[in-house]
Amino acid sequence: MVCAGASEISMAQWASAYVESALGISKNIGDIIGPCLFAIMMGISRFFYGKYGEKLDLMKFMIASGILCLICYLLAALAPLPFLNLVGCSLCGFSVGIMWPGTISIASKKIPLGGTAMFAFLAMAGDLGGAVGPGIVGLVTQAANDNLKIGVLAGCVFPAVLVLSVLLLKRKREKV
């Protein structure tokens, strides 16, 4: 859940500044375009899973979403064209859309008697990731002479750890 929160909020929080610097547009337009495209794509992802979720394996969907998120971070950080950087930012919204609800669903199935305490712990873990993730991106950006692409590249660690965690959980589940 920490990695889900960090993956989502790191890109969402930095999207407007990233769009401004990558596309060279004004702050007002960047504040609208970056977060809006991210949010629209996130909504599409949640709508898609809400409509077709019962037909999909949640673990596989989470792994695919984490891999897509990693690709989006790489595209946002490394693509040579500003338009592709924007595509990476936007598609990241789609990739993170299932991470929080998916983590809650997996935990609910794994720990059916977890109750309120489990949901509180998951919320706290997501919030921790949402606080620490953007902070790490910001610190790396600042250390790299305000190069936001380097900061976003450092953010690749969040979806990578999420994918590894889900793979380990899936592997453990298959052994039982």
Where are each of the predicted segments found?
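Multi-pass alpha-helical transporter architecture, strongest
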Residues: A154-V176
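Extracytoplasmic gate region of multi-pass secondary transporters
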Residues: M1-C36, I40-G43
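Transmembrane alpha-helical cores of Major Facilitator Superfamily
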Residues: V2, P35-I40, I67, A120-L128
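Structural signature of the two symmetry-related core transmembrane helices
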Residues: K60-L75
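Paired small-residue
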Residues: C72, F83-L91
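Interfacial helix-cap and linker-helix signal at transmembrane-aqueous boundaries
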Residues: V19-E20, Y52-G53, V137-D146
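Helix-to-loop junctions at the C-terminal end of transmembrane segments
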Residues: I44-D57, T141
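Intracellular juxtamembrane helix-capping segments at the cytosolic ends
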Residues: I98-I111
